[in-house]
A protein has these predicted regions:
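Amphipathic alpha-helical interaction segments
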Residues: 9, 49, 53, 73, ...
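Short amphipathic alpha-helical interaction segments
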Residues: 17-20, 111-151
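Short, structured coil/loop segments at alpha-helix boundaries
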Residues: 34-39, 70, 101, 122, ...
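Short amphipathic alpha-helical interface segments
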Residues: 57-121
């Protein structure tokens, strides 16, 4: 696969890859036989490490970052990188305000955190997407900004999703 990827690289741009990148990447690649998405990430990293036009951008920590991804998270990152203009993902937290006599409703209970259905069609375990988002944020691959987004249409599909309807019923 690396040979295919390197096919577009001019011969004069080939360089010796850094051993602290290539050795662990090949080791990790051998553990990823069941996930094409993870294999693709390792292959791209290996190919980039052998192309002197971009090899300076390859950091040894990238191997361990890929190693901390699930196949679904790799799919999500691939989806986001290929979607034109996809600089945000609508995410909601569903809370219920506790009923009490206070004039200001200060107590609430979290029913669902970090939920989105944007990735449901591409991941194997849609019920884990909020965990995946937390991990991608922990790895600094995504930034979880908390603010009110004005594009309400982006949220309609989420609010009308089966999971949110079921939570609201309970």
């Amino acid at each position: 696969q690396v040979d295919r990827k390197m096919g577009d690289v001019p011969e004069d741009c080939f360089c010796e890859p850094a051993p602290n990148v290539v050795v662990p990447a090949i080791q990790q690649l051998s553990y990823s036989y069941d996930s094409q998405d993870l294999r693709d990430l390792y292959v791209n990293l290996l190919a980039s490490s052998m192309d002197k036009r971009v090899s300076y951008l390859v950091h040894p920590s990238f191997v361990s970052i890929i190693g901390q991804l699930t196949p679904d998270e790799a799919k999500m990152m691939s989806f986001l990188s290929k979607e034109p203009g996809k600089d945000h993902v609508p995410v909601i937290d569903l809370r219920v305000v506790e009923d009490d006599d206070m004039p200001i409703k200060a107590r609430w209970r979290l029913l669902c955190e970090n939920y989105t259905n944007v990735f449901d069609a591409i991941v194997q375990c849609p019920e884990n997407v909020s965990l995946y988002l937390n991990n991608l944020e922990r790895l600094k691959l995504l930034s979880g900004e908390t603010y009110c987004y004005e594009g309400e249409d982006d949220y309609l599909g989420i609010e009308d999703s089966e999971r949110i309807r079921n939570i609201k019923k309970d």
